[in-house]
Amino acid sequence: MKFRSFSALAPALIALVAMFSVAQETLAQEAPRVKFATNAGDFVVEVYPDKAPKTVENFLQYVKDKHYDGTIFHRVIDNFMVQGGGFDARYSEKKTRAPVAHEGREALAKGGLKNLVGTLAMARTNDPQSATAQFFINVKDNAFLDPSTQDFGYTVFGKVTSGMEVIQKIKAVPTGPAGPFGSDAPKTPIIINSATLVK
């Protein structure tokens, strides 16, 4: 009788264990999220270490080191992108670690994101291996920035998950020359008060 009772319960127990395992796996795979608090409002991004592991590790280390706190969006181009993470409000360039390896092609090959509206990508110079701390958020679909067999493109490693209206507000601010920049700098600084890992 006891054996029969256990046999009847066995499928339910197996299902419960399976559900618990799936839940654990889902939690383990959940993307890290970073909250940016700015003087224009807050927004949250999530990043994908399974697609661009070195880039995400680099970015999150800068977050943990408080590198982004007090930096500005120094390059804002409506109908293109908003860029920040490299200069403070006095337009002094912040020190960075060594560049991170470019992962754009590898990320796309793993099913990563393209440079679509709301995506987060690494900024760099003309040297594909020069990305350090600066990032940009696409405010339109910018397919010409995507990696290809002929071009390295720009590594996309995350996207905005909440507060996109703040990015829309930032992209529309009046811009002009400021600091070392001849154009595209907000006339009223857009300051990142803090960048915090929330998961």
PLM regions and their residue ranges:
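Cyclophilin-like peptidyl-prolyl cis-trans isomerases
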Residues: 2-8, 16-199
